[in-house]
Amino acid sequence: MTKLLIALILFSICWKPYSAEPIASFFDGLDSRNECKARLDRRLTGFSGLLYSHSKYGQEPYNTSRNCVLMLVAPIGYSIRVRALQFDVASTENARTCEKDTLHVFDHETTLDPESYAPARIDDITSPGPIIGQFCGHFENRILNTSSHNALTLWWHSNPNGSNSKGFKLHWGSFRVSKTGNCVTGEFSCGNGECIPIESACDRFADCSNGEDLIHSRQMAANCQNIELDPLTTVSGVFVLLFSATIILSLCGFIMFVCCLCKCLKSTIPIKGASSHTTTTTATDYKPDPPQFYPPSPPKMPPPSAASSYTPRLHHHFEGPLVPSETSAFHSSNRMQNHYSVNSDINGDYTYVRNDVHRNLL
């Protein structure tokens, strides 16, 4: 059970389902479709898209000495809204004037046919309409401008001096304002009177001005197929509560198991210094420990004085013949007494003791 819960958690973290991405284009690209052009002969048509300042956005600063013009055209009946997701363009101290590198926005005064590359009027070639915005500096997630009809023209130019700024990443989308407040089939209602194409509601970018198209429940109600789901935010509160309780109980059970295991291992480990045979000892197996002490040494007697010229010698106490009438017991005791008795010197100067000599020799 614990392994299954861990697998679900890892799956919810690592799982990133496919989400619909708008088509990405570049002001200053490497191929012919994204080539920088200085005239109104390049168009991007559709419901929405992403637009980068240059092909190596995020890797290198934008290119210098660029003069690129690009037209955005939506289906007839829709307007265009441009949002800056990331914007980093070098500017002067007064960012309102944007005297150096600048992105200009022009609003067309007439409706353009998205199916035709020929302009509706010849004047559109040289005059895309009034300028409604110019941008530089640094900001994020900001709506730049909204068109009056179905077309906007963007003009991006950079000076030859160079800059370390990253450039910009724009998202443009189409919408229309419903007079009745209702959207037709194939559209998504933003809830504020705006309607957007259902394809735009199923991506991960805000096409509604209020961001209503990023709510997962609204996307699922619109039958969006390719949406990025977060399991922890799309499930019900009861499921989240049960899932959390299961994780907590599993952790408590694991902690209790570890504690019991440690307790069992501690009880089986023998104590240091304890005897392993405490109940099976017998009298035959018992061996007393040797004593941890030694008997005291005998006292040392002082050596005989060198001042005396007398050298002790062994006297023969039995120089004469023994009396035959003495009993064997008397003879034995007399011999023992003579052997260990104290003998005096003839002169009476020094007493010789056999035991003392033996002790000194030891």
Curated annotation (Swiss-Prot):
Domain CUB span(s) in chain numbering: 36-175
Membrane topology (Cytoplasmic): 259-362
Cysteine-cysteine disulfides: C36-C68, C98-C136, C183-C195, C190-C208, C202-C224
Location of this chain's protein in the cell: Cell membrane; Perikaryon; Cell projection, Axon; Cell projection, Dendrite
Domain (LDL-receptor class A) ranges: 182-225
Residues of this chain annotated as glycosylated in UniProt: N63, N145, N161
Region described as Disordered: spans on this chain: 275-311
This protein's UniProt keywords: Cell membrane, Cell projection, Disulfide bond, Glycoprotein, Membrane, Receptor, Signal, Transmembrane, Transmembrane helix
Membrane topology summary: Single-pass type I membrane protein
Biased segments, Pro residues type: 289-305
GO biological process: positive regulation of cell migration
Protein's name according to its UniProt entry: Abnormal cell migration protein 13
Organism from which the protein derives: Caenorhabditis elegans
